Amino acid sequence: MIGLALNDTGILAAGPDEMLLEIEAGALASPGFAVIEAGHLQVGVAAEKRCRQVPRQTNHHFWDQLASAPLQDPAYAGWTHADLAHAHLKAIWKQLAPVHRDVLVAVPDTYAEPQLELLAGIMKALAIPVDGFVSHALAALPKEAPAEILLHLDLHLHRTVLTVLDCRRAPVVLGHASVDGFGLDRLRTAWMQAIADEFVRRTRFDPFHDADTEQALYDHLPTLLDELKQTEDTEVAMATPDDTHRIRLTRDPLERPLLPLMDAIHRQIDILQQDYFH
C-alpha cells in the first residue's frame, strides 16, 4: 500500500517504508497547477513552471474548490475543476501505477461529503485502487504521538487549516478551522513583490516588467528561502539579455508578509482553545 497526500502545494506519495516516491519524472511533489495553451493541458510541475508566463491560462484553484460546475474562465470553457483534478491524478497515477497497488488517500480536513464523493468518483474512473480516505492531520501524526489534545497546522495554496486532534485514546479529529485566503500562493506573491521592490530600489530593474524574469524569480524562490534559513542574507541575481542584476537580500523583507498570516492563525487558535482545550 502507498499513501497519497492531496495538498495542492504539492501532492506527495509515500511507500510502506515511509520514503517519498517519485510522483512525476524527477520530482517528489506534484503541485496543483494546470495550464492550457492551444488546447493542450499541462498539470503539475510543468504547469507551475509556466504559471507566471501565462497567468490567464493558469488555474491553481481546482483542488481547493473541487466541484463539477462549469468554469466561467474563457480559457477553460467546457472544463470543470473536477476535470482538472482528474487530469492531475491521471498523470500522477501513470507514474505510480506500474509498481504500486492499493492507495490510502490523505485529504484536506476542509473537504466535506460532496468533495469526497466527487474525489471517489474521479479515482474510480481512473481505476485507482483506493483503500480509504483519511484526514490530513491524522495522517501526519507520528507513530508515538503524545497522549493529549494536539493542534495540527496545514498550509495549502489558498488557505491554512488548523485541525484539533484528540490523541488521549485512539486519535480522532475533534474539529478544524480554516484561515481562508492565507495560503502559500499569497505568501509567494508577497515575497516576490518584496524582492522586486528591493531590485527596483537598488538597481531600478523590475523583475515584473517581463514575464520570463517574473517566472524565473518564482522558480528561484524556494532556493532563496532555503538559503535564508541558513544565513542572514543571500545574493539574488536576475539575468536579462542585456545584463545581470544583483542584490543582497536579507530575511526582513520576507518576514513582514508573514505577520498577517500569523495574526490570523493566532486568532483562530484562541477560538479553538476556548472550544477544545480546557
What are these regions (language model features)?
Residues Q72-D83, H245-D263:
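Glycine-rich phosphate-binding "P-loop"
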Residues D166-R251:
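Phosphate-binding glycine-rich/basic clefts of nucleotide- and phosphate-handling proteins
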Residues P98-D109, F208, D212, I271-H278:
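Short glycine-rich phosphate-binding loop at a beta-alpha junction
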Residues G10, D17-A106, L228-E232, V236, ...:
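Conserved phosphate-binding loops in N-terminal lobes of ATP-dependent enzymes
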Residues M1-S30, E37, K143-L174, W191, ...:
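Gly/Thr-rich phosphate-binding beta-strand-loop-beta motif of the actin/hexokinase/Hsp70
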Residues P114-E198, R251, L261-D263, R267, ...:
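Small-residue (GG/TT-enriched) beta-loop-alpha framework at ligand/catalytic clefts
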Residues L84-V99, L141-E144, E255-H278:
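Phosphate/ATP-binding catalytic cores across multiple sugar-kinase/actin-like superfamilies
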Residues Q65-Q72, A91-Q95, A125-L126, A194-R202, ...:
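Conserved, well-folded catalytic cores of nucleic-acid-processing
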